[in-house]
Amino acid sequence: MSADSTLIRIWDRPVRLFHWTLILLVALSFASAKSGAWALHYVSGYAILTLVLFRILWGFFGSENARFMHFLKSPLAALRQLGRIAKRDRDTETSHNPAGGWMVVVLLALLLTQAFSGLFASHDPGFSYSQHGPLALKVDEATSESLSALHLAVQRYLLLAIALHVLAIMLYKLVKGHELVMPMLTGEKLLPEGAKAPRLASGQLALGLLVLAGAAVFLFIRLF
């Protein structure tokens, strides 16, 4: 740590738990689909849907730097950020940078679409078996087939987005010297002296929003 740097807590526990739990659930979803472990696939899908809804709520009501209005900048700002990716400079971000902010939105949108379409999927032609989602029989066959095709297509875009996300993290570490993984593990980041720590929301609020998201998913599936 240099003399003019200080450790600042930038990521709250709810964001960090969301991030790492989501990684495990996405891996579990792919593995369970490939192996045909459908009960497990359903559970992981429900959990992903709940977590994504929670993160959307947290993006409006959660910690200061987790809110969309805090880290979402213009597309032009994101392009300028990417244009400086080869330039080694000092990391001053207390949230996602402009490009990273848009990647968060893209990943959330893809995960939401993937999990929602899976509820109604009837047959995935990309695999060697046939299986329907828990709500597939609640809609007509044409709708189920359309959502099945969407479920398969979004899977490819999701894998691409994840690969780009990991590549960007590696480039920021190796080229720019910015450490992005450890702050998401510990919550703390080494920033220039005088950097302002973001206001972090309470764990009780996070728990309440998580319960709300879970209840919404449960009621939708039961009452659809």
Which positions does each model-derived feature cover?
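Membrane-embedded alpha-helical bundles that constitute the cytochrome b-like, heme-associated redox core
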Residues: 1-224
